[in-house]
Structures are given as C-alpha cells and as structure tokens.
C-alpha cells in the first residue's frame, strides 16, 4: 500500500474509536426509556449523542482515508494529554460540590490551555463564554438539577 493509499492512520483510528464509543453508549442508552423530544426519557440524551458521535466518527474516518499522511506525526503532547484527562476527572468529581458554573470554567480553562496556541486571556474568555452557554442551556433551558454554585460556595 502506498503512502497516498494509506491515508491518515491517526484519523482513521480516531474515527473507529469514536464509532466504538458511540456504539457502547447507544447500547447502554437503549436500555432506558427513550421518551420523545418534548418528554425526554433517561435514554434519550445518551442515544442522541451516541448517534451524533457515530456520524462524526464516520466523517473522521472518511477524511482520514482521503487525506495524505503526514511525514512525521511528531511527539506526544503530554501537556495536552494530562490537562484534558485531568479536566475530565475534575468535572466528574467536582460537578456536585463545585456546581455547574465553576466546574465548567475550570475544565474549559484547563482544556483550552492544553493547546500552546491559546493564551491565558483567550482561555479565560472561552471558559466564561462556555459557562454562560452551559448555564443558559442546562439550567434555564433544560432545568438540570445540578446546582449553579455548589456546597463549596455555601449554597
């Protein structure tokens, strides 16, 4: 197989991983009541997100097959790997005690700083915008029961 025919192995593998994760979430989500768009059951959100992730994975794989591979993938970005994984762990552990707004600010800031292209200012702006969007969508729009500011802040 020539280099042109091989495509971007990273994108193909990433697309496959997205599809596999989507399949797991779709299977687990289908065990719950689905409901409707206006009366969402507990299985609605995981299944819909799984379908979207599978579509994204398919597009990523197709793009990977069409792309000319890079000569050198470069070293692993340990900074990005550690910051993103740590942000996910903080979100999981800190959502209830910290509340929606603080945990979104912290996790978005950390994830944005994983890229060396972002400045502290741009990461801060992203974090604040994401916190406002999450508040509007999840607290006002969907009435999620997660506290806006958790018990750590005396609420």
From Swiss-Prot:
Protein name as annotated: Uncharacterized 16.3 kDa protein in TAR-I ttuC' 3'region
Alphabetized InterPro entries for the sequence: DUF1468
Top-level taxon in the UniProt lineage: Bacteria
Keywords carried by this UniProt record: Plasmid
Protein species of origin: Agrobacterium vitis (Rhizobium vitis)
């Amino acid at each position: 197989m020539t280099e042109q025919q091989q495509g971007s192995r990273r994108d193909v593998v990433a697309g496959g991983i997205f599809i596999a994760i989507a399949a797991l979430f779709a299977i687990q989500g289908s065990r719950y009541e689905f409901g409707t768009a206006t009366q969402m059951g507990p299985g609605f959100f995981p299944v819909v997100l799984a379908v979207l992730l599978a579509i994204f994975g398919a597009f990523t794989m197709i793009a990977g097959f069409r792309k000319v591979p890079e000569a050198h993938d470069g070293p692993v970005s340990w900074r990005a790997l550690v910051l993103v994984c740590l942000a996910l762990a903080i979100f999981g552990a800190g959502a209830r005690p910290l509340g929606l707004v603080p945990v979104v600010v912290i996790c978005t800031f950390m994830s944005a700083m994983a890229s060396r292209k972002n400045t502290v200012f741009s990461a801060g702006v992203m974090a604040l915008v994401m916190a406002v969007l999450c508040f509007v969508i999840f607290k006002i729009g969907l009435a999620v029961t997660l506290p806006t500011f958790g018990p750590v802040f005396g609420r």
